[in-house]
């Protein structure tokens, strides 16, 4: 008769533990992301990882925690620096083994609206995205289990995990969830352009012409001037969750999306990056080949390379595309760049909620 009593006791203990975790989880304060209505509500927050104040705060600590790397010297912020709109100013970043990454570090602004991450879209969801740099041998180079063991031995992290998840047990899954929560709060929505949309800023003549060029399709037949940027970078968030070959090479040196899908039609296609804070995130493109906005505009204006998978919006059979040339004047290019500078959000790069908590 002893065994049933023991089993019953174990079951009751487990139920009590689960109940305590549930109550503690409910005690964590829900956090509603703050963003303008014109951003739209097509956001992505998994049901099993809701935003909470405690989870986001834990994620902030983890984002700047060097113990998550094999050499205890590299954190997520190593490649994603707040003052650079969470990029690092390099064409390719250096990991724990001194090896350069294969592609340019992307900005982390406004990830709340994204489902497929990295230039090639390999990761679905921020939780899956976070695991890649943490465990990649050429980036942070450490198994999640090892990272969890290191954090479990610290003085402060067990308590932080307990507040966020109900118990002090640290696991790789919880590390990923906390990081994802923090990164979903990195919202940039107070640029000069946002102030213009809200009616609190009056653009200069150059900025206004830049806005018009950005959102207008050119048509040589009707003498309509435009840069047609909005096909890929339309809407107030300045990106669409699509993959395009933007004419960098006639024969792509990097297969891009095709490395994931295995489809030849995806060769040379990469995820459309946000233009938010674009003036702060040089160098540009997946390989960091352009160091200035002037070089980027020149590329789209007159250096598009034809290839079988070139985006339909850049092909030379489109109205206004004069043999893959937009034909913007020097003055128009300056005005377009003036608009791109309007997308800089000074409050985003100085917001203490996103800053290094160890300083």
Annotated model-derived regions:
Residues 126, 137-142:
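Mobile amphipathic helical/loop "lid" adjacent to a hydrophobic cofactor/ligand pocket
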